[in-house]
Amino acid sequence: MYIFIMEFIQTINTYLQLFIENYGFYGVFIAMFIQAIIPVAIPSDAVIIAAVLLNVNPILVIIASALGSTSGGLIGFTLTRKGGKPIAMKFIGKKQIERFENWFERWGNYIIVFGRAAPFLSSDAIAFAAGLTKINIKTFVILALIGAVIRSIILVYLSDLIADYLPDII
């Protein structure tokens, strides 16, 4: 099983590298957009690390990754807003949803910014969760973009620091 997982990761890294080499800034945007909608498809941190290791302009990486992640997050937010509540109620129940809404109403802005900004954690669930609440879509986009920019800056910086030590990863 371990060998299968390692081969799978290597395959994703290879395709990700080729995609970013061929499409640069646009490749980063598209990969981040896709991973925000389907989080298991492409790890967002790997996209940024690959772009930095491939010498894509760091400012463009930050812009493309933040815009791609936020745009994809908006799709997830909208899908959940339009039809996710009945599905969520089946899995976690009305009482838990109400508790979550109250908690999110109190701390939601912080949750969105810090949840989207934290590197090496899945920030995409935040968009889907926010869609279950009453948060204004414009507020969500602004907060999600702020968090995505912070995350991108942190990952570009860390990737640049470790680039010399990890030439064989991607």
Task: Please describe what each predicted stretch is.
Residues M1-I30, L54-F128, L132-I170:
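Membrane-interfacial helix-loop-helix
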Residues Q35-S44, G115-S123:
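Short helix-coil transition sites and intra-membrane helix breaks within transmembrane domains
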Residues V47-A51:
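Hydrophobic transmembrane alpha-helices of multi-pass, membrane-embedded glycosylation machinery
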